[in-house]
């Protein structure tokens, strides 16, 4: 299965128009705060299956401004959250008073805190085996009851179509609620867009 096939099969069941946004250099950045985001995710977790969220900062926003295809990737998920302080500052100056910085690590921490209670399952894709082992140890010691569905460190080279299909099947078999992708920008956003659905 190739990337195009994933996109053809994906049909969003929630409305992007329900999310307030501030367009910054062509990227629709969610004009929200952490509380709004956590409530939204908790209330729509099943409907968001197969979708993605970009954690956007100044670097990714400028890159999207300069690269039309990457801009489509940034805008193609359910939302792009304001990881960069300057993004939320621009939004606030434009009248979006509730637009606050939401860093990737802070979002992860907040999701992990409620995961045992909500029964959320997590899959981690990216980095090295050593880093994933350390992450597993920290998460299971810090967030009691967290369900880690799986972890995978992809090769540091382009994957073959067969390898990609195998890992997608492996991830799907674990039935995660969240797939945390750590490949570095812009690679991670492109991976999420290619595997949307």
What are these regions (language model features)?
Residues 1, 119, 195-197:
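N-terminal hydrophobic signal-anchor/signal peptide
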Residues 66-67, 92-94, 136-137, 191-194:
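Short amphipathic alpha-helical segments
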Residues 78, 149, 177:
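Conserved acidic residues
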Residues 88-174:
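Conserved beta-alpha
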Residues 163-197:
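A contiguous pocket-lining binding segment that forms or flanks enzyme active sites
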């Amino acid at each position: 299965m190739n990337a195009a096939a994933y996109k053809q099969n994906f049909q969003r069941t929630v409305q992007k128009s329900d999310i307030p946004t501030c367009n910054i250099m062509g990227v629709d950045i969610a004009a929200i705060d952490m509380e709004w985001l956590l409530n939204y995710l908790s209330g729509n977790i099943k409907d968001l299956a197969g979708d993605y969220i970009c954690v956007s900062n100044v670097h990714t926003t400028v890159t999207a401004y300069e690269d039309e295809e990457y801009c489509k990737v940034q805008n193609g998920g359910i939302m792009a959250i304001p990881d960069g302080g300057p993004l939320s500052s621009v939004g606030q100056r434009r009248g979006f008073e509730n637009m606050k910085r939401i860093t990737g690590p802070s979002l992860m921490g907040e999701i992990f805190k409620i995961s045992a209670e909500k029964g959320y399952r997590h899959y981690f894709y990216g980095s090295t085996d050593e880093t994933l082992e350390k992450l597993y140890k920290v998460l299971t010691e810090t967030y009691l009851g967290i369900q880690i569905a799986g972890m995978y460190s992809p090769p540091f080279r382009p994957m073959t179509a067969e390898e990609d299909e195998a890992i997608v099947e492996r991830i799907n078999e674990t039935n995660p609620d969240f797939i945390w992708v750590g490949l570095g920008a812009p690679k991670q956003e492109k991976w999420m867009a290619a595997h949307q659905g």
